[in-house]
From Swiss-Prot:
Protein name, entry field: Esculentin-2SE
GO CC terms of this entry: extracellular region
One protein family per Pfam: Antimicrobial_2
Recorded superkingdom: Eukaryota
UniProt-listed InterPro entries: Antimicrobial_frog_2 (IPR012521)
Expressed in which tissues: Expressed by the skin glands.
Family listed: Belongs to the frog skin active peptide (FSAP) family. Esculentin subfamily.
Function in brief: Mast cell degranulating peptide. Causes histamine release from rat peritoneal mast cells in vitro. Has antibacterial activity against the Gram-negative bacterium E.coli K12 and Gram-positive bacterium M.luteus NCT C2665.
Protein location: Secreted
Disulfide bonding pattern of the chain: C31-C37
Keywords assigned by UniProt, alphabetized: Amphibian defense peptide, Antibiotic, Antimicrobial, Disulfide bond, Inflammatory response, Mast cell degranulation, Secreted
One GO term of the biological process aspect: defense response to Gram-positive bacterium
Amino acid sequence: GFFSLIKGVAKIATKGLAKNLGKMGLDLVGCKISKEC
């Protein structure tokens, strides 16, 4: 029902957020290694 729909959207949102945070983390590590911050 409605609640499961919200749970599904929340799950997708968390996945997207985790992916974005992971990408940002990788970018930060890469810039620290190459000293191009």
